[in-house]
Each structure stands twice: as C-alpha cells, then as structure tokens.
Amino acid sequence: MASTTNNTPIDTVILDIEGTVCPITFVKDTLFPYFIEKLPSILQKFQYPLPTTTTSDNDDDDDDDPVLNILKQLPENIIQSWESIFNHFKNLVDQDIKDPILKSLQGLIWKQGYENNELKAPIYQDSIKFIESFPTVKSKDNQRKIYIYSSGSIKAQILLFGHVKNSSTSTTSSSIDNDTIDLNDKLNGYFDITTVGFKNQSNSYIKILQEINKSQYPQSVLFLSDNINEVNAAINAGMKSYIVIRPGNSPINDEDKKFHKIIYSLDELDL
C-alpha cells in the first residue's frame, strides 16, 4: 500500500458524499424511502408489458419519456408488469446494490423531489464551509479544485449539491430560497460508477487521476471517505486519502486507525 504521508502540497480534493459531507442517514432514511414511496405511481402510468428497445425503435413517443427509456434497459422478464419492476428495484435498494439502472431512475425521481422542495440535502456545515473556501485560497498555480465521487449518479450529485439546506448567514454560494443554497458553482466535476467504476477498486481512482490530469502528481490529490475500502483503493492508486468519521457511520477498527489519518470534521483540514 502506498503511503499517505508525503510533503507534496494538496491542491485537489475529491469528496465522497454519504457519511463524509452528508449524514449517512440522509440517503438511507430519506432519499431511499422517498424513491420507494414515489415509484409505484410512476410505474403505473405505463402499459405492460413494456416495449423492449427492439420493439420500440420506430416509436418516437417512447424516446420522449426518460423514465421509460431507463426501464427499457431492464431484462425482458422484469418489464412484464409494474409490480415486477417495483419488486426488482426495491430488492436492489434493500440490499444497497449499486446498480447503474437503479441509480439513473433514482436520480430522476429525486429531481422531482428537489424541485418540489420536498427534498433538501443536509450537508454538514463544516463541509459547506470547506467547499466554499478551499478553491478560493490561492496556491502556487491558483488551481485548487474540488471534485465529487459517489456511487449515486452524476445527475443525483448535481441535484443534491444544488439544493443544500443551509443555516449559515455567511455563505458565499447562490441562494435558491431563504434556507437553500447551490454549491455546484464551487465544484469542478463529478464522477460516479458509470464513468470511472466502483469505489472500492483502485483502477477507478487511476481513471480519475487521468481525467483530472493528475496521473503524474497523484500525491497532490486527497480523497476523503468514510469507507475504509474506498480509502485503501485511493491510496493504492497513489492518492492521499483520509477516513472521515461522522455520527452514524460504520465503526473503524483500531488497526485501521493506526495506519490511516482520521478526521471528524473538514474543519480539521489544514491544506
């Protein structure tokens, strides 16, 4: 395993979302249940069995419905009824399986929730402060950047950071209403499992380094996550990586605490 102790200055930070900048309970206790609650009424508006990609090639109307286009990616035996589709997705959610089709559909349904003001992202205040301030501090080449890497789709990431619940009066981000701000203009890019791969695989972080032109300077990149497997994967790709401990996160064993830097708030970062 590569060492995370290196004097190379950090000018790029990659943030995980749940359990790192956002309470892990928001995804499991708010976003997932919201998706399951809204799913039946969305599925029931279609006629079953759904057309497959092959049978609907000449139906231009099908292409106008983003939900239907996602559902048509499912195996034919699943799209015979709305109940079978619902059970399929509910099973994936219950088992916390990172399925790309599920993530795409969740992103669409969450979009409606954010736009209807039914959903707001409870980003930690220390994380809001860091995201707003880190890029504004000048480095030698003035290229300090923040990226997001999450198993949730990029669309879902943009929605989440675009509808952040804020209790501070000193924010520098654009306001949507009195208690909602948009942090997306502070972020330089987003990655998910469809663009670079799964978060517990080192090759995913190697791809990110290539995408952000940091392959030659991996130690100038810091990845923050609550997941030890993700932290190890990032370190093995050459990055620096710290474990973030937040209320409700899975416990970190003493052995891992010995060999990894631990932080409890992004306020602890001195970059």
From Swiss-Prot:
SUPFAM superfamilies: HAD-like (SSF56784). One of its GO terms (molecular function) is magnesium ion binding. Binds 1 Mg(2+) ion per subunit. Keywords: Amino-acid biosynthesis, Cytoplasm, Hydrolase, Magnesium, Metal-binding, Methionine biosynthesis, Nucleus. Its main location: cytoplasm. It catalyses: 5-methylsulfanyl-2,3-dioxopentyl phosphate + H2O = 1,2-dihydroxy-5-(methylsulfanyl)pent-1-en-3-one + phosphate. Mg(2+) binds at residues 16, 18, 226. Pathway: Amino-acid biosynthesis; L-methionine biosynthesis via salvage pathway; L-methionine from S-methyl-5-thio-alpha-D-ribose 1-phosphate: step 3/6; Amino-acid biosynthesis; L-methionine biosynthesis via salvage pathway; L-methionine from S-methyl-5-thio-alpha-D-ribose 1-phosphate: step 4/6. One of its GO terms (biological process) is L-methionine salvage from methylthioadenosine. It is found in: Cytoplasm; Nucleus. Its EC number is 3.1.3.77. Substrate binds at residues 150-151, 199. It comes from the Eukaryota. One of its GO terms (cellular component) is nucleus. Its cofactor is Mg(2+). Monomer. Bifunctional enzyme that catalyzes the enolization of 2,3-diketo-5-methylthiopentyl-1-phosphate (DK-MTP-1-P) into the intermediate 2-hydroxy-3-keto-5-methylthiopentenyl-1-phosphate (HK-MTPenyl-1-P), which is then dephosphorylated to form the acireductone 1,2-dihydroxy-3-keto-5-methylthiopentene (DHK-MTPene). Belongs to the HAD-like hydrolase superfamily. MasA/MtnC family. This is Enolase-phosphatase E1. It comes from Candida dubliniensis (strain CD36 / ATCC MYA-646 / CBS 7987 / NCPF 3949 / NRRL Y-17841) (Yeast).
